Amino acid sequence: MSSGGLLLLLGLLTLWAELTPVSSKDHPEFCELPADSGPCRGILHAFYYHPVHRTCLEFIYGGCYGNANNFKTIDECEPPCAA
């Protein structure tokens, strides 16, 4: 393979590594779920783990259903997901 081809391959692998979410081996699978406000119309401040940003972010939760990536406080979100 030419040096240009190797450089391209290295660049693509680097890009893939940066854009791929953290492996679920580092935290539970529910941490990979998107924020889900659910079908209800409440306005509750909640937190979810954002795998690309690798941090817990605030969102508005409707009050019912949603998914497991939903925490009442940032202190509840960080230990299982951001650790």
Curated annotation (Swiss-Prot):
Q: Where is the signal peptide?
A: 1-24
According to its UniProt record, where is this protein located? Secreted
Spell out the residues of the site Reactive bond for trypsin.
41-42
Keyword terms: Disulfide bond, Protease inhibitor, Secreted, Serine protease inhibitor, Signal
Task: Report which superkingdom the organism of origin falls in.
Answer: Eukaryota
Q: In which tissues is it expressed?
A: Expressed by the venom gland.
Which pairs of Cys residues are joined through disulfide bonds in the record? 31-81, 40-64, 56-77
The terms under GO molecular function for this entry are:
serine-type endopeptidase inhibitor activity
Q: Does the entry feature the keyword Cell membrane, yes or no?
A: no
Q: Which residues form the BPTI/Kunitz inhibitor domain?
A: 31-81
Q: What would be one Pfam family of this protein? A: Kunitz_BPTI
- Tell me, in one coarse class, where this protein mainly resides: secreted
User: Which SMART domains does this UniProt record tie to the protein?
Assistant: KU
Gene Ontology cellular-component terms for this entry are:
extracellular space
User: Known InterPro entries for this protein?
Assistant: Kunitz_BPTI, Kunitz_BPTI_sf, Prtase_inh_Kunz-CS, TFPI/VKTCI-like
Q: What does this protein do?
A: Serine protease inhibitor.
Give the similarity note. Belongs to the venom Kunitz-type family.
Quote the protein name from its UniProt record. Answer: Kunitz-type serine protease inhibitor tigerin-2
The organism is: Notechis scutatus scutatus (Mainland tiger snake)
